[in-house]
Amino acid sequence: MTEFTHINQQGHAKMVDVSDKQITKRTAVAHSSITVNETIYKQISNNTNTKGNVLNTAQIAGIMAAKNTSTIIPMCHPLPLTGIDVHFSWDETNAPLYTLNIQTTVSTTGKTGVEMEALTAASATALTIYDMTKAVDKGMIIGETYLESKSGGKSGDFQRQSGQ
């Protein structure tokens, strides 16, 4: 029978005890995206959105989300994050639709990984872009959100293969 790590003997939720795990450097990289129309693309690129600088605000939202992951995802450990970075790149190959790729990198030196923090940062970044531009078009599409890579920890390294 499978032993559930987040369920105690009484069948109730619990946070995994990581006291005996080794402290190691851990890094996770996550990806998300949002596809927008040409008007929104131009507003973001030219910094002319009436709500302000969309990318700067979205970066801050992603950083805040990573820092607060344990408050919104049950059983996530609160972690002392040592680095959070949010990068953007446009894919203009399907104009008049434009996809903004979001890559988040989160690091810590600790006893548990930062995959959830990187994924939460990527998600919140995309959601913030949607929120700041929805007055122009509510038809935007938030794309797949996934872990690109992780390093450190007992389970070792992970690198997503293309097509995976």
Swiss-Prot record:
Keywords: Lyase, Molybdenum cofactor biosynthesis
Record EC number: 4.6.1.17
Pathway(s) of this molecule: Cofactor biosynthesis; molybdopterin biosynthesis
Gene3D superfamilies recorded: Molybdopterin cofactor biosynthesis C (MoaC) domain
Lyase among keywords: yes
Ligand binding (substrate): 75-77, 116-117
Catalytic activity: (8S)-3',8-cyclo-7,8-dihydroguanosine 5'-triphosphate = cyclic pyranopterin phosphate + diphosphate
Keyword tRNA processing appears in the UniProt entry: no
Active site: 131
Pfam families associated with the record: MoaC (PF01967)
Domain of life: Bacteria
Protein family: Belongs to the MoaC family.
Function, in words: Catalyzes the conversion of (8S)-3',8-cyclo-7,8-dihydroguanosine 5'-triphosphate to cyclic pyranopterin monophosphate (cPMP).
Subunit structure: Homohexamer; trimer of dimers.
HAMAP family on file: MoaC_B
Name assigned to this protein: Cyclic pyranopterin monophosphate synthase
Organism field: Staphylococcus aureus (strain bovine RF122 / ET3-1)
